[in-house]
């Protein structure tokens, strides 16, 4: 993967800004969905000594999908390379990804609805560093 591909969805552009926290640029696929679930629930379980706080509220809050099309269109105006018409089927893709993550979590006896923020965050983390569309041109 080309370096520029890692930052294709960073808007505003992040290079040169101060970063605090771990480098998530290539975390996608490095850990299982269950690992991310547990890490966000209680980081010390999977990373002893971690100073990361837990994020318990994302396990209860549902994601808000009603604004997804508008958010996609806004990102397109900023130059994010979503394909034409993606705003209209983004929630369908979101649901497919969410259902796949829930299925993976069930393999480890973790039960949660596909509409929770934790599922969206796991989907996001699993994509980090895996989008190589620019390199394929």
Question: Where are the model-predicted features located?
Answer:
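C-terminal capping alpha-helices of c-type cytochrome domains
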Residues: 31-137
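Surface-exposed acidic, glycine/proline-enriched linker/cap segments
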Residues: 5-16, 99
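Short, small-residue-biased leader/transition segments that mark boundaries at the very start
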Residues: 1-3
């Amino acid at each position: 993967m080309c370096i520029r591909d890692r930052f294709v969805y960073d808007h505003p552009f992040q290079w040169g800004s101060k970063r605090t926290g771990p480098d998530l640029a290539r975390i996608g696929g490095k850990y299982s969905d269950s690992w991310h679930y547990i890490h966000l629930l209680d980081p010390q379980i999977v990373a002893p000594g971690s100073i990361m706080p837990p994020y318990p509220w994302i396990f209860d809050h549902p994601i808000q999908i009603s604004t997804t099309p508008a958010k996609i269109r806004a990102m397109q105006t900023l130059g994010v390379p979503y394909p034409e018409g993606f705003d209209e089927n983004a929630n369908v893709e979101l649901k497919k990804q969410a259902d796949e993550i829930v299925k993976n979590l069930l393999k480890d006896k973790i039960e949660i609805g596909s509409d929770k923020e934790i599922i969206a965050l796991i989907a996001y983390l699993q994509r980090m560093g895996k989008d190589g569309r620019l390199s394929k041109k």
